[in-house]
C-alpha cells in the first residue's frame, strides 16, 4: 500500500502542475462577440451640383484636347449616371446656370462661354466661392467645385491675407457642420496642359505648361461614400495627383461571416500563436483613399498591444463591404470591451509641398498653387476634433 501511495501522490502532483501550467499560459480559446452594424441601403435621391470657376485664370485650361476637359467630362459623366439629377453652374463672384446639358458639357468649357456669364472674371475669392457653394449644399445633394484654387495675393501683408482666408474657410465649414454633422469634404489635385494668361495682383504673363487644378466634392458623407463605391477616382481620365478628405467619426458598418452561435465566433490560431478574426467592414463614409485604408498602421486598438489589425484586404469595386480587416488577438488576452479606431494622419505632406506663398514668379512655381495649403488647412481646422474617422466595437471573451 505504501508503494502504491508513493506512486499515486507524484502522479496527482504532476496532473495538478500540468493543469496549472496550461491555465497560467492562457491556453483557453479566444472568442469575439459583437452586434453587427448594418449598412444603410438608402434609396434617397441624390442631386449633383457642378460648379466650374470661370474667372479669367481658368481660360488656359480650356484648349481643345486638354487633360482638364477630358477629366471633367469623364468624371461628371460617370457620376451623372449614378445620381438622379445633375445641375451645371459657372461660378465667380456670382453663380450662373449652364446653358447646356451634360451631353454638351465639353462644348460649354471654353473662354467664350465663360465670358458671357454674370459676375466679375477679373478677380476671384476662392474662400467666398466655397462659402456660396457650401450654403447651397443640402442633405440630399453633392456639390462639385472645379477650380485652380489660386488665392490672389494683394500687395502688402501676404501672411495676414492667407491667415484671414484660412479663418474664413474654417468658419464656413464649422457653421455647415453645426447644421449638417455628416458633411464630408474631398479635395482632389490634378494637372493639365495650360495655355493662356497667368494673372498676378498687378499684371499678367502668358504661359504654356502643365498646371495644377482641383476638384472639391462636398456633401453628406453617406452620399459621397455611396458615389465613391460606384465611381472610383480611377474613373477620372488621365488620373489624379493627390487626394485629401475630411469627415466626422463613423460607427463603421461591419459583420463577421460565420459564427458558432449568434454574433459570437471562435478565432483561428495563426503561426504566431494569436487568434485571428476577419471583419467585413464598409469604410466608404471615412472618404479616405485606398492607400490610407490599406495601411494597418492607421488602425488602433483601445486596449493596447494584445489586439491589432494584422492585415487589410480590399473588396472588389461595387461590393456591399469595402474591406476585410484581419484582427490578431494574443491568447493571454483577458475578457474585455474593445474598440478599433481608424485614425489616419490629419494632413498629408503634399499639401505643404505644392503650396506657394509668394504669388510671384510663376515659372519657378509651375507645379504649385498660391495659398492652397491655407484653404485645405481651413477645412482641416473645422474637423480638428474628429481625430478618429471610424470605430468598430466588440467584446473579447474566452472559455
Regions found by a protein language model. Give the residues of each.
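Short, compositionally biased P/S/T/A/G/V-rich stretches that sit at domain boundaries
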Residues: 223-271
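VWA/integrin I-like adhesion module and closely mimicked acidic/polar interface patches used
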Residues: 150-210
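Extended non-globular C-terminal regions
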Residues: 254-399
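Conserved beta strand-loop-helix elements of the APE1-like EEP
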Residues: 207-229
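Well-ordered, non-membrane alpha-helical segments in soluble/globular domains
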Residues: 64-75, 114-131, 157-177
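Von Willebrand factor
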Residues: 41-147, 151-152, 185-187
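Acidic, polar low-complexity linker/tail segments
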Residues: 4-49, 56-61, 390, 394-399
Amino acid at each position: 500500500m505504501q508503494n502504491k501511495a508513493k506512486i499515486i501522490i507524484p502522479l496527482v502532483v504532476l496532473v495538478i502542475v500540468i493543469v496549472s501550467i496550461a491555465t497560467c499560459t492562457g491556453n483557453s480559446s479566444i472568442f469575439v462577440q459583437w452586434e453587427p452594424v448594418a449598412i444603410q441601403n438608402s434609396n434617397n435621391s441624390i442631386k449633383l451640383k457642378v460648379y466650374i470657376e470661370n474667372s479669367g485664370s481658368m481660360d488656359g485650361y480650356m484648349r481643345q484636347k486638354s487633360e482638364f476637359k477630358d477629366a471633367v467630362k469623364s468624371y461628371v459623366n460617370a457620376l451623372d449616371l449614378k445620381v438622379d439629377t445633375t445641375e451645371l453652374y459657372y461660378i465667380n463672384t456670382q453663380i450662373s446656370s449652364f446653358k447646356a446639358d451634360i451631353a454638351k458639357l465639353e462644348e460649354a468649357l471654353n473662354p467664350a462661354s465663360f465670358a458671357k456669364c454674370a459676375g466679375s472674371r477679373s478677380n476671384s475669392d476662392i474662400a467666398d466661392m466655397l462659402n456660396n457653394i457650401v450654403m447651397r449644399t443640402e442633405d440630399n445633394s453633392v456639390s462639385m467645385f472645379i477650380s485652380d484654387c489660386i488665392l490672389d495675393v494683394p500687395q502688402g501683408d501676404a501672411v495676414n491675407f492667407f491667415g484671414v482666408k484660412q479663418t474664413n474657410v474654417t468658419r464656413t465649414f464649422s457653421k455647415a457642420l453645426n447644421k449638417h454633422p455628416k458633411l464630408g469634404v474631398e479635395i482632389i489635385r490634378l494637372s493639365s496642359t495650360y495655355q493662356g494668361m497667368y494673372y498676378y495682383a498687378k499684371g499678367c504673363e502668358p504661359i504654356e505648361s502643365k498646371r495644377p487644378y482641383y476638384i472639391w466634392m462636398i456633401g453628406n458623407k453617406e452620399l459621397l461614400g455611396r458615389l465613391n463605391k460606384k465611381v472610383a477616382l480611377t474613373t477620372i481620365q488621365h488620373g489624379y495627383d493627390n487626394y485629401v478628405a475630411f469627415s466626422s467619426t463613423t460607427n463603421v458598418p461591419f459583420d463577421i461571416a460565420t459564427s458558432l452561435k449568434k454574433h459570437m465566433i471562435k478565432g483561428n490560431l495563426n503561426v504566431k500563436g494569436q487568434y485571428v478574426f476577419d471583419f467585413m467592414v464598409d469604410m466608404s463614409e471615412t472618404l479616405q483613399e485606398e492607400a490610407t485604408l490599406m495601411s494597418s498602421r492607421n488602425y488602433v486598438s483601445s486596449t493596447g498591444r494584445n489586439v491589432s489589425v494584422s492585415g487589410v484586404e480590399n473588396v472588389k469595386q461595387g461590393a456591399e463591404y469595402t474591406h476585410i480587416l484581419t484582427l490578431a488577438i494574443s491568447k493571454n488576452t483577458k475578457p474585455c470591451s474593445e474598440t478599433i479606431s481608424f485614425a489616419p494622419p490629419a494632413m498629408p505632406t503634399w499639401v505643404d509641398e505644392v503650396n506657394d506663398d509668394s504669388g510671384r514668379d510663376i515659372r519657378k512655381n509651375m507645379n504649385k498653387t498660391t495659398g492652397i495649403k491655407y484653404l485645405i488647412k481651413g477645412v482641416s481646422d473645422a474637423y480638428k476634433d474628429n481625430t478618429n474617422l471610424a470605430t468598430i466595437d466588440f467584446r473579447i471573451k474566452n472559455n
